[in-house]
Curated annotation (Swiss-Prot):
Post-translational modification: Phosphorylates at Ser-59 in mature trophozoites, schizonts and gametocytes but not in rings and young trophozoites. Phosphorylates at Ser-59 by eIK2 in salivary gland sporozoites but not in midgut and hemocoel sporozoites. Dephosphorylated at Ser-59 by UIS2. Phosphorylation of eIF2alpha subunit of the pre-initiation complex eIF2 inhibits recycling of inactive eIF2-GDP to active eIF2-GTP by limiting the activity of the guanine nucleotide exchange factor eIF2B and thus, inhibits protein translation.
UniProt protein name: Eukaryotic translation initiation factor 2 subunit 1
UniProt KW Phosphoprotein keyword: yes
Function statement: Functions in the early steps of protein synthesis by forming a ternary complex with GTP and initiator tRNA. May regulate protein translation in response to amino acid starvation. May regulate protein at various stages of parasite development.
Species, as recorded: Plasmodium berghei (strain Anka)
Subcellular location: Cytoplasm, Stress granule
CDD domains with a match to the protein in the record: S1_IF2_alpha (cd04452)
Outcome following mutation: S59D: Phosphomimetic mutant. Lethal at the blood stage
Pfam families: EIF_2_alpha, S1
Gene that produces this protein: eIF2alpha
Amino acid sequence: MGDARSKTDLGDCRFYEKKFPEVDDLIMVKVNRIEDMGAYVSILEYNDMEGMILMSELSKRRFRSVNKLIRVGRHEVVLVLRVDNQKGYIDLSKRRVSPKDIIKCEEHFSKSKKVHQTVRHVAQKHNMTVEELNRKVIWPLYKKYGHALDALKEATMNPDIIFKEMDISDAVKESLLSDIKLRLTPQALKLRGRIDVWCFGYEGIDAVKEALKKGKEISNNEVTINIKLIAPPQYVIVTSCHDKELGMQKIQEAMKVISDKIKEYKGGDFKQQGEILVIGGDDEKRLEELLDKHDGLSSDDEYSSDGDEDDSSNDDDNSSDEDDDD
């Protein structure tokens, strides 16, 4: 076998066998630029083919600022309105996409992306192009099993059945299985909840420290609660765990403990800011930037402020800007 191909030699390829999306398909796009006619986007599942969301298809409601609806660099779920295979024109709509559509598309895209990342790695390792491996293995699996990831999951247990009659070497099969197993390993979720805690009474700083300390003490073997200072009276409760519901439950429990404790002091009070969120991508980066100058608060920490810093993340921004291929 020759040297593995470089990334530029892989001949990157669309996720699916069909060359264009079809009318009424839900697809994931990345916004590249916004002009008078609309937003120009890259269609991620179709090798960054260009499409356009017309201004009239951005929202059902009137809007003054386009940036409140769509931003350059963001990922968006859109509906395919028209496809001109000859000219390569693809018209898209954001306003016709329902919240259920977004969830459905994000789940499908996440599965397809795992498959595509595996294909890229295996193709590079075995001196193949992405399209070659897609044609030999992945696209037939989509056709037969509905989604290639479901088939590859089954292949980790029954490889002879799934890969039967496929024209690939045992080495390629092993690489596909080992790579997909790694991608199927559950990843820890990071959750955060923002709170304000203050005490204008005599105990002041000590009261706040004691309340936050009590909140951290609810940590157990499954969930560790960390509390970070943003700028008094703003704090963020952060935890990582595999079980989203358990993580949210523990953050809520910590909030209650902190609230109950601080209210024992004269002048002490507590307020939750927004909902508990799963964070990742840009949200996590913004949070890290905020906390860069602060360590976790303990009973010995200084109660100090560098000004009213805020993480400016919008709780109603639901699009997840996933990183491109690993």
